């Protein structure tokens, strides 16, 4: 019986590249090489992705951030009819936007911690933010990180 050809895509073009390289390495180390033909795909740019994914039966996504979790690599894989790990195009794209994700969660009455989106260039009053959110505050970019 022919081995299933599995590609592990890691690296990528986001600021989370180094984490992605380690994540992908962990996936590769755990795959049974006697059962699967494993192809290590270190993504350095978007232009090589189609040729790198040729002749694969399945893809493990070890990518993080931009072009990894934002729906774009998922769209490429779907256009090539290659099954992959993780969420689909729409859910990946929506979940990369923290503010939209929180609004969707709130819309379905799912409990979530208070949040506040502050956009670049907007004036804000730190004391009012602390009073609204309370206690310790974690600041993160809306997408990535």
Segments the model singles out, each with a brief description of its role:
Residues 1-90, 94-96, 100, 107, ...:
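ATP-binding N-terminal substructure of ATP-dependent carboxylate-amine bond-forming enzymes
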Residues 9, 116, 140-142:
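Short beta-strand segments
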Residues 104-112:
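Basic phosphate/pyrophosphate-binding loop/patch that engages nucleotide-derived ligands
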Residues 105-106, 130-145:
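ATP-grasp fold ATP-binding core
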């Amino acid at each position: 019986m022919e081995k299933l050809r599995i590609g592990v895509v890691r690296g990528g073009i986001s600021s989370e590249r180094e984490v992605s390289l380690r994540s992908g390495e962990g996936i590769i180390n755990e795959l049974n090489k006697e059962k699967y033909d494993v192809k290590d795909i270190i993504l350095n740019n978007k232009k090589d992705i189609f040729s790198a994914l040729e002749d694969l039966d399945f893809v493990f996504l070890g990518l993080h951030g931009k072009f990894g979790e934002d729906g774009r690599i998922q769209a490429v894989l779907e256009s090539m009819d290659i099954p992959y790990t993780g969420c689909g195009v729409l859910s990946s794209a929506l979940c990369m936007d923290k503010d939209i994700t929180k609004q969707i969660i709130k819309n379905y009455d799912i409990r979530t911690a208070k949040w506040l989106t502050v956009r670049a260039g907007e004036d804000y009053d730190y004391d009012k933010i602390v009073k609204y959110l309370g206690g310790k505050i974690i600041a993160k970019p809306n997408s990535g990180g």
